[in-house]
Amino acid sequence: MKTFTATPETVTRDWFVVDADGKTLGRIATEIATRLRGKHKPEYTPHVDTGDYIIVVNAEKVTVTGNKAKGKTYYSHSGFPGGIKQISFEKLQAQKPEMIIEKAVKGMLPKGPLGRAMFRKLKVYAGAEHNHTAQQPQVLDI
């Protein structure tokens, strides 16, 4: 029997909605990254994007354990000398709560064109509302 290899034409993608209210950041991010890659499907193929679409709501209510809310720092650099910027978890959660989940999931995906295609299937919203009701997403309980 030949080994099955998925092709982009044969892949079926579902839409799932995840509620991040009260969930731990790392635990929710690993499950989202696995679903975006498609590793939960039997037809998973490493060089083909077989993952599903994931909608995350209530990103502002995601939690971290221990003292990470005060101690966790996110860095970015402009590329110019002295252009490093840092922001704590608490401040980032107040300013751009979507970025916390996006950054955690992006680090768990492959680097390169395939990883960027997988990351584009992630939709994160700070509040409880999203504008993807036409896709009829299923609730994914993590």
Curated annotation (Swiss-Prot):
It comes from the Bacteria. Keywords: Ribonucleoprotein, Ribosomal protein. One of its GO terms (biological process) is translation. The keyword Ubl conjugation does not apply. GO terms for cellular component: cytosolic large ribosomal subunit. CDD domains: Ribosomal_L13. One of its GO terms (molecular function) is mRNA binding. The keyword Nucleotide-binding does not apply. Pfam families: Ribosomal_L13 (PF00572). Belongs to the universal ribosomal protein uL13 family. This protein is one of the early assembly proteins of the 50S ribosomal subunit, although it is not seen to bind rRNA by itself. It is important during the early stages of 50S assembly. Part of the 50S ribosomal subunit. This is Large ribosomal subunit protein uL13. The lineage of its organism: Bacteria, Pseudomonadati, Pseudomonadota, Gammaproteobacteria, Alteromonadales.
